[in-house]
Amino acid sequence: MRICSDQPCIVLLTEKDVWIRVNGKEPISLKANHMALLNCENNIIDVSSLNNTLVAHISHDIIKDYLRFLNKDLSQIPVWQRSATPILTLPCLTPDVFRVAAQHSMMPAETESEKERTRALLFTVLSRFLDSKKFVSLMMYMLRNCVSDSVYQIIESDIHKDWNLSMVASCLCLSPSLLKKKLKSENTSYSQIITTCRMRYAVNELMMDGKNISQVSQSCGYNSTSYFISVFKDFYGMTPLHYVSQHRERTVA
């Protein structure tokens, strides 16, 4: 039986002993009540037996949110080897939770609460694989088709770091010139991405009690508070203080 998904990643749960074959290679045996995490994009996946209701479909956005949630320095994560079979397997400890997560992953989220519930359930499924040393590498590999996403993930994994183009390119095993070229083809640039990352972080910091503009500026990697205010105003159309006051007015209203 061939597995198809319009998402880059799936996690399946077995009800009985099965085998899984990826791209025609030697089949991998999987016992009952085991999970397999697979990269679906550009891969042919066959399984000897499968209950379609026990497949969780995981989108690029969920992967990006999950890597951000882990708060790891992604620059230290080894690159996934292209020659490796893109699959991780392990026993399932909470099959009932998995069933609910799989069900939600196939349902359109009609409300914000349903969207957040699905997100939380899929995070729970993914977290089972955290003990695997290759897990985060495989997650990053699944974002490879969009280089800008990978750059966002690397910078946001340690926003305080003094990043530059060469450092990020090295994390992706690319030359700085090739990274610039790839980002340009995606209608963005390194400077746009790092500014967006810093501004997102700045807003979160500003909403925390006790954080002043100078502290937020430094935590976002800016040595000059006045320059930080200028960049913030260009990005959001208002100064940091104006942004905070508007947010508080909306909250009170």
UniProtKB/Swiss-Prot annotation:
Keywords: DNA-binding, Transcription, Transcription regulation
Alphabetized GO MF terms: DNA-binding transcription factor activity; sequence-specific DNA binding
Induction details: By acidic conditions. Forms an operon with upstream adiA but not downstream adiC.
PROSITE patterns: HTH_ARAC_FAMILY_1, HTH_ARAC_FAMILY_2
Gene3D superfamilies (alphabetical): Homeodomain-like (1.10.10.60)
DNA-binding region extent: 166-187, 213-236
Cited Pfam families: HTH_18 (PF12833)
Highest taxon of source: Bacteria
Domain HTH araC/xylS-type: 149-246
InterPro entries: Homeodomain-like_sf (IPR009057), HTH_AraC (IPR018060), HTH_AraC-typ_CS (IPR018062), Tscrpt_reg_AraC-type_HTH (IPR020449)
KO phenotype (gene knockout): No change in arginine-dependent acid resistance.
Example GO BP: positive regulation of DNA-templated transcription
Name of this protein: HTH-type transcriptional regulator AdiY
Organism: Escherichia coli (strain K12)
